[in-house]
Curated annotation (Swiss-Prot):
This is Flavodoxin. The keyword Electron transport applies. One of its GO terms (molecular function) is FMN binding. Belongs to the flavodoxin family. Its cofactor is FMN. Keywords: Electron transport, Flavoprotein, FMN, Transport. Residues 2-137 form the Flavodoxin-like domain. It comes from Megasphaera elsdenii. PANTHER family: DIFLAVIN FLAVOPROTEIN A 2-RELATED.
Length: 137
């Protein structure tokens, strides 16, 4: 089972989650997609393959009222998990994703892939690739 957990402010990261979910299903794996606000750390940590989505906020950082505290609580439970990261951005160069990937690797998790898209994804190959990687993980 692949668990997709995301936060979206404008709909772009949600669109990415939908594209990734479709790719996981097309690759033959079971998948569940949920917003950070609608799940809890223990449920997410119980999954073997976890895809986390958050757009770049502020000065290239994670959304700070929901995603950052959730990830901080989840981090100690990620050791040995297969984790993918995704998100959209409107400015900057994707530094938030590089930092998030490093933080995730520092937990002992294996990062199976990342996907970043400028603005709205439209059949973004990055989303398909991440979904396929998650299905095979």
């Amino acid at each position: 089972m692949v668990e997709i957990v995301y936060w979206s402010g404008t709909g772009n990261t949600e669109a990415m989650a939908n594209e990734i979910e479709a790719a996981v299903k097309a690759a033959g794996a079971d998948v569940e997609s949920v917003r950070f606000e609608d799940t809890n750390v223990d449920d997410v940590a119980s999954k073997d393959v976890i895809l986390l989505g958050c757009p770049a906020m502020g000065s290239e950082e994670l959304e700070d009222s929901v995603v950052e505290p959730f990830f901080t609580d989840l981090a100690p439970k990620l050791k040995g998990k297969k984790v993918g990261l995704f998100g959209s951005y409107g400015w900057g160069s994707g530094e938030w994703m590089d930092a998030w990937k490093q933080r995730t690797e520092d937990t002992g998790a294996t990062v199976i892939g990342t996907a970043i898209v400028n603005e709205m994804p439209d059949n973004a190959p990055e989303c398909k690739e991440l979904g396929e990687a998650a299905a095979k993980a």
